[in-house]
Amino acid sequence: MKDTLGNLSLDEKIGQVFVDMLWNNTNDEIKERINKYGIGGFRYNNMSPEQLYEQNKIIQETSKIPALIAANIEAGGDGGVKGGTHFGYHVTIGATQNKENAYKLGYYGCKEVAAIGCNWTFAPIVDINKNWRNCVVSNRCFSSEADVVLEMSKEYLQGAKDAGLASCMKHFPGDGLDERDQHIVTTNN
């Protein structure tokens, strides 16, 4: 690892902390971004399994260090690949009161996207739903009860880990109170 990092330029080391959002980019554009900026992570748009497999293969072949390739595996493999299995939103899984369902969501959803080269999930959603009008988490979080969110999230995380994916819990720093979308405006949470 020391040798690998030692052989990177300062710009390439800086590039490792960035995650690039891919949106219908050509393979040549992806290669150019990696070669020019040394980007270490990618978040991609939902495409067919064949397209994603090829895209992710090119990312890894072009990168000097194995890249992180992320998707939103919140409700199943359909969050990462067209035609992937939709298991259910977090609120549906939470309503079952069965932690095994949260594990299965993490495991099987992540297993599907791992098959096409994804290795990082932007899930679980660990927000606590305190306002049913919240447009971001009202149907995307496990519960309005902190204990349920905690237990379901732990199970999801274990499932994702067992499927071979790294997980990034969200949101930032938390959502669920305000009615505004913190992806677009500053909210009061």
What are these regions (language model features)?
Residues 6-10, 138, 164:
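A general, composition-driven signal for non-globular sequence regions
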Residues 152-155, 159, 163:
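Metal-dependent enolase-superfamily TIM-barrel catalytic cores that perform enediolate-based chemistry
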Residues 1-26, 156:
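Boundary/entry segment of secreted carbohydrate-active catalytic domains
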Residues 6, 114, 161:
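Short polybasic/polar patches that bind polyanions
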Residues 23-26, 30-151, 171-189:
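Enzymes and membrane/adaptor proteins characterized by extended Gly/Ser/Thr/Asp/Glu-rich
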Residues 14-15, 64-66, 117, 161-165:
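Short coil/turn connectors at secondary-structure junctions
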